[in-house]
């Protein structure tokens, strides 16, 4: 599992929502 990629996607999603 590529945690950095997952966290990156979550970070982008959060940034888009905020």
UniProtKB/Swiss-Prot annotation:
Entry GO terms, CC: extracellular region; membrane; other organism cell membrane
Record has Membrane as a keyword: yes
GO biological process, one term: innate immune response
Expression across tissues: Expressed by the venom gland.
Residues recorded with modification Isoleucine amide: 18
Superkingdom of the organism of origin: Eukaryota
Alphabetic keyword roster: Amidation, Antimicrobial, Immunity, Innate immunity, Membrane, Secreted, Target cell membrane, Target membrane
Similarity comment: Belongs to the MCD family. Mastoparan subfamily.
Protein name: Communis-AAAA
